[in-house]
Amino acid sequence: NISFRKELIKAWDKDMIYQERTVTMITLLMSYSLCISVILYRKMKVLLIDVYNYNKGGAETVCFNTGKLLEEHGHQVVYFTLKWEENNPSPYSKYFPESKETRKGPLKQVKNMVNYFYHFEAAKKMEQLIKDERPDIAHIHLMWGQITPSIFPVLRKYHIPILFTVHDYRIVCPAYTFRDGSGRICEDCKGKYFYKCFTHTCCKGSKVMSAVMAAEQYFRNAFF
């Protein structure tokens, strides 16, 4: 219940190291459970999806470690990320859609805003990758506000099973953190009142960013 979750968050706040280790352990167990299932089943082609193709943070570490473990057991791993200057070389880079940093042209900012809600190129590139590589399963790590849920209809179209490792609270909290602009523990959105992200200025102290994040959450819940 809500009160229990609040007490749990308070307890974690007393020891951030413990919190980080706990979250890391949960995500690792979820990822490795996929590996174990695949290893015990048959050799498969696994599509790993993340925003970045380099070690930007914990989600990428889990993603790449999962891929390494799968490959060690004879499975083929295909990566799908956005383009970034820091990306590691990849044989699948031709399928990577543009990111907000690599996109060019006079309409860059407009496209960046549109693609925060729905990334048309990501959907197109995902479909081409699936046609060429024919993965057996997709394992998503990060995608919010970057790759976006635009890839979901494509994965469903080709009947690709999806595993989603949740690395943060973005599914239910526009600000990712269950905290408002003042740092107070907050669950006021309750899965549907996302305008409160704007009224509480939850996202990095910015009304504009909070409004965009809330709007994206409404859009995603309405169409996906």
Predicted regions and their residues:
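N-terminal subdomain of nucleotide-sugar transferases
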Residues: 34-86, 131-133, 148-151, 158-161
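Short N-terminal targeting/anchoring amphipathic segment
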Residues: 128-146, 161-165
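Membrane-proximal helix-turn-helix segments that form the acceptor-binding/catalytic region
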Residues: 157, 170, 185-224
